[in-house]
Swiss-Prot record:
The keyword Acyltransferase does not apply. This is Porin OmpL. GO terms for molecular function: porin activity. InterPro entries: Bact_OM_Channel_sf (IPR053713), Oligogalacturonate-sp_porin (IPR009331). GO terms for cellular component: cell outer membrane; pore complex. It is found in: Cell outer membrane. Disulfide bonds: none annotated. Residues 1-20 form the signal peptide.
Length: 230
C-alpha cells in the first residue's frame, strides 16, 4: 500500500516532469553531429497545485572554439482548468534572449492520468522570433514554427520514471529546417531516478532529425543532468 501511495503522488507531479518546491538544475549535452557541447544552469519553483516558473541560462562549446553564450529564458505555466481529478488543462509561455535577438512561445498542455503509473500530456505550441532571417526567397521574415509535443510519462517504480517525448515542428513561413524540409521531428527519451527528497538525476537520449548541411548526418544528442530540491 505504501508503494502504491508513492506511485499516486509521483503520477500527480510527473506530468510536467517536476516535483514541488524550489530547485536548481545543471545539465550537460553533447550533439554528435555538430560536435557541440551545451552547459545549462536553471533555477525554478513548482507549487503543490502545479503552477511553476523557471529561469534558464546556457552556454555552448565546440571543438577548437571558445565558450559562447547560448540563451537566457524565463518560462511559466499555470493549471487553469481541472474538470476532473484525471484531466488538467494548463497554459504556459516563455520569453528568451540570445545574441541574434529575442523570441518567445505560448503553449497549451492537456494532461490525462490514465492509471497511477501512466499519464499523457499533449502540447500545442507556437514559437516566435522577434528578429528577421533570410527566407528561401531571399526575403527577410520571422522564422516562426508550430509545434505539437507529446509526453508519455511512465512510473516504473517509486524511484524510477521514464518519459517518451516526440515533438513535431512545422515552419510557418518560407523556411526549411536543418533536414531540408519545412517540417522536422525531435524525439527525446528521458530516464529519471529519484535518489532522495533532494536529488533527482536524469539521463536523456535525443534524436533531432537529419542535418543536410553542413553536417550531412543524423543529429543525435546525449544529455546528463540533475535537479536539487530544497
Amino acid at each position: 500500500m505504501k508503494s502504491l501511495n508513492t506511485l499516486v503522488i509521483l503520477t500527480s507531479v510527473i506530468s510536467t516532469s517536476v516535483f514541488a518546491g524550489a530547485y536548481v538544475e545543471n545539465r550537460e549535452a553533447y550533439n554528435l553531429a555538430s560536435d557541440q557541447m551545451e552547459f545549462m544552469l536553471r533555477v525554478g519553483y513548482n507549487s503543490d497545485m502545479g503552477a511553476g516558473i523557471m529561469l534558464t541560462n546556457t552556454y555552448t562549446l565546440q571543438r577548437d572554439d571558445e565558450l559562447k553564450h547560448g540563451y537566457n529564458e524565463i518560462e511559466g505555466w499555470y493549471p487553469l482548468f481541472k474538470p476532473t481529478d484525471k484531466l488538467t488543462i494548463q497554459p504556459g509561455g516563455l520569453i528568451n534572449d540570445k545574441s541574434i535577438g529575442s523570441g518567445g512561445a505560448v503553449y497549451l498542455d492537456v494532461n490525462y492520468k490514465f492509471t497511477p503509473w501512466f499519464n499523457l500530456t499533449v502540447r500545442n505550441r507556437y514559437n516566435h522570433n522577434n528578429y528577421s532571417s533570410t527566407d528561401l526567397n531571399g526575403e527577410l521574415d520571422n522564422n516562426d514554427s508550430y509545434e505539437i509535443g507529446n509526453y508519455w510519462n511512465f512510473i516504473i517504480t517509486d524511484k524510477f520514471s521514464y518519459t517518451f517525448e516526440p515533438h513535431y515542428f512545422y515552419n510557418i513561413n518560407d523556411f526549411n529546417s536543418s533536414n531540408g524540409t519545412k517540417h522536422h521531428w525531435e524525439i527525446t527519451n528521458t530516464f529519471r531516478y529519484r535518489i532522495n527528497e533532494h536529488w533527482l538525476p536524469y539521463f536523456e537520449l535525443r534524436w533531432l532529425d537529419r542535418n543536410v548541411g553542413p553536417y550531412h548526418r543524423e543529429q543525435n544528442q546525449i544529455r546528463i543532468g540533475a535537479k536539487y530540491f530544497f
